[in-house]
């Protein structure tokens, strides 16, 4: 049996690599929004949309009158078209809403499928158009690499997810036995209690982290730029990064617990 697995690692790009990542993120967002704008016109007229291959064939012509698109990874631009095609397929199959325009605020990411260039070694990873990038991760995919997704989180930290295929033995279903069953019940002054008498208390670090984020958000609301329509000052952006990092810290605490 073949399974898709992924390794997510934080990366530390230098100034030049960081610039290239930000450029690719912006160009992929531009392609996605431009294709969505064109597909919206087609949908209003004929209730259909351009498929992936039709959108992909438009890219070479766009690069002729928009030469700055050549700065980005070509595979990443194609994958932006593929994402939009998937979104429209979900919409027409009534499993999702109408696709929305991408914004430069919040989490951003792009995916590259050039597997001939993608390489993972201990403490470094090689990506198309970027070269080798430092990472604290020592795990190496033990299968064939499918694609890599580079993301910029709201706390200004860069990550890459390497998706690969791995062949594993077939899973044998386990038949539950009475002696292997554990019952859980609600505990009013804690988290839970099990059928063996073991109890677990509610972790207090989560509430403490939430209170810290509330204080940071209160300071953010007093900075110039917190009101709608105001220009975002440098102090506002600095405080916003602190809030985002605290939110990421809380999410990691919940995930680890």
Region spans (language model):
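Short coil-to-beta-strand transition motifs
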Residues: 5-8, 143, 177
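Acidic carboxylate diad motif detector
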Residues: 53-153
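Generic detection of short hydrophobic beta-strand segments and adjacent strand-loop junctions
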Residues: 7-11, 133-136, 200-202
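Substrate-contacting helices/loops that form the catalytic groove of nucleic-acid
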Residues: 41-66, 147, 153-257
């Amino acid at each position: 049996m073949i399974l898709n697995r992924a390794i997510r690692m934080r990366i530390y790009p230098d100034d030049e690599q960081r610039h290239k990542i930000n450029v690719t993120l912006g160009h992929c967002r531009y392609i996605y929004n431009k294709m969505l704008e064109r597909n919206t016109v087609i949908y209003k007229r004929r209730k259909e949309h351009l498929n992936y291959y039709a959108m992909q064939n438009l890219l070479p012509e766009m690069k002729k009158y928009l030469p700055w698109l050549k700065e980005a990874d070509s595979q990443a631009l194609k994958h932006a078209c593929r994402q939009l095609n998937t979104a429209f397929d979900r919409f027409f199959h009534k499993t999702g809403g109408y696709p929305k325009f991408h914004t430069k605020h919040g989490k951003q990411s792009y995916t590259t499928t050039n597997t001939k260039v993608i390489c993972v070694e201990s403490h470094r990873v090689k990506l198309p158009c970027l070269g080798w990038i430092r990472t604290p991760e020592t795990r190496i995919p033990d299968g064939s690499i499918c694609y890599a997704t580079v993301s910029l989180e709201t706390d200004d930290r860069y990550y890459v997810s390497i998706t690969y295929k791995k062949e594993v033995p077939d899973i044998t279903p386990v038949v539950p036995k009475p002696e292997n069953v554990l019952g859980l019940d609600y505990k009013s002054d804690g988290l839970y209690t099990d059928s063996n008498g073991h109890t677990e208390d509610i972790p207090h670090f989560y509430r403490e982290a939430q209170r810290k984020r509330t204080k940071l958000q209160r300071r953010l609301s007093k900075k110039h730029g917190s009101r709608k329509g105001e220009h975002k000052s440098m102090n506002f952006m600095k405080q916003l990064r602190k809030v985002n990092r605290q939110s990421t810290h809380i999410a990691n605490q919940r995930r680890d617990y």
